[in-house]
Amino acid sequence: MIGGCGSLFLPGTKICAVDSPKFWLAYWRSMADSYAHVTYLEQRFGNGAARLDIRAYRSARGAQREGRDTPEAQFVRESHEKRATENDHAKPLITACRTSLMFFEGNSSLEWTFVSPPAMYRSGRKTGTYETLTDYIPLRGDQNDSGILEGRLKGISTFDFAIAIADEAERRNFREQHWTAWGEISDDEPAPSPYINL
């Protein structure tokens, strides 16, 4: 089964990322600060309001970082972050992924594995390498510190995530476990769109 990163726990806790306002804030800030991630999200969202929202938020964060902040940019940042931490639009879907995991946990009547991508999952180049972790969201720095999450969320390319899933199908290292895989995505160049517009 494939879920979402929101079902992974924050380090040292039994709090799922989906239930943590500080996760949502770190998630959207990290997404907005990455040109490759913004492009990936725009490809997924299409030409709707969500596409404009992420682009405006990225621009507002850039204005603040570059010392050219305006009241309008501040409004965009504050309203986006308030919405993200109070009731992010993706929360119902991610909560549903967590619920589906709960149907498997403790169930030994069938052989299962449940993989969740790390927070910074996107199209990107194939490296063929990845690392794994069970139950917890992978972070840069001290993996046991769930204090500040901003700038610490790890990721993986869709190619490397697919390799991790295929490897698990063959090796079965994570039977009856919830796990994740992450890899190198340091380049900030958008990958060609994996989506086809009809």
PLM region spans:
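Generic beta-sheet signal
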Residues: 1-2
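Oxidoreductase cofactor-interface core, primarily capturing Rossmann-like NAD(P)-dependent enzymes
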Residues: 5-198
